[in-house]
């Protein structure tokens, strides 16, 4: 992980309860976050009563996971990276509107392009291929045709999300150590 040069690491594996990261020393990394506290921060940091930890969303980060929760973390990091670049340039900046429209469409209405912002972006690292990402369920008794349809649906779901939030995916990749 250190040799890959990432600025921040998010572990998104277990939507309801964070699972422990398989490399014990990871918590010594300065910018390591589990998904649930990170998502909680994003949903509440704008509230005047929020008194939890602050998160410094950094560019060129990885999200390690592969399900819907990891996609949410990628989406959040991308929204925050764009917010950091454009909030002062857009009167009444609205991150919720950007989430609903998607980054390209939101920026387009202000004659801006993501490519011009100088953002490296977030990369989702998934240990298997996209067709095995648990974005839709495949019943155990599914016919081969149904299995194939669900796998195509998984790729379509991911591609739609990539188009909307502009993060990257490294499939069949898994960190195995810190150095």
Regions found by a protein language model. Give the residues of each.
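Feature captures the FAD/FMN-dependent oxidoreductase FAD-binding
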Residues: 1-23, 176-179
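A Rossmann-like FAD-binding core segment of flavoenzymes
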Residues: 9, 83-179
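Glycine-rich dinucleotide-binding loop and its adjacent helix/turn
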Residues: 18-111
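Short beta-strand/turn micro-motifs composed of small residues
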Residues: 13, 65, 126
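Short, structured coil segments at secondary-structure junctions
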Residues: 5, 27-28, 165
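Solvent-exposed alpha-helices and their adjacent loops that cap or buttress functional pockets
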Residues: 3, 52-56, 114-118
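Short, surface-exposed amphipathic charged segments that create phosphate/polyanion-binding patches used
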Residues: 2, 47-50, 137-140
């Amino acid at each position: 992980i250190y040799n890959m040069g990432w600025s921040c690491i998010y572990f998104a594996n277990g939507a309801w309860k964070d699972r422990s990261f398989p490399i014990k020393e990871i918590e010594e990394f300065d910018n390591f976050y589990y998904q649930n506290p990170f998502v909680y921060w994003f949903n509440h940091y704008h509230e005047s009563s929020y008194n939890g930890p602050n998160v410094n969303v950094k560019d060129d980060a990885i999200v390690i996971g592969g399900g819907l929760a990891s996609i949410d973390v990628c989406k959040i990091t991308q929204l925050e990276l764009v917010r950091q670049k454009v909030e002062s340039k857009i009167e009444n900046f609205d991150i919720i509107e950007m989430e609903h429209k998607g980054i390209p469409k939101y920026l387009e209405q202000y004659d801006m392009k993501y490519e011009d912002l100088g953002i490296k972006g977030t990369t989702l690292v998934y240990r298997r291929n996209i067709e095995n990402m648990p974005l839709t369920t495949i019943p155990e008794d599914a016919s081969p045709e149904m299995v194939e349809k669900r796998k195509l649906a998984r790729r379509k779901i991911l591609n739609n999300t990539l188009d909307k939030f502009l993060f990257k995916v490294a499939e069949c990749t898994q960190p195995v150590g810190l150095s």
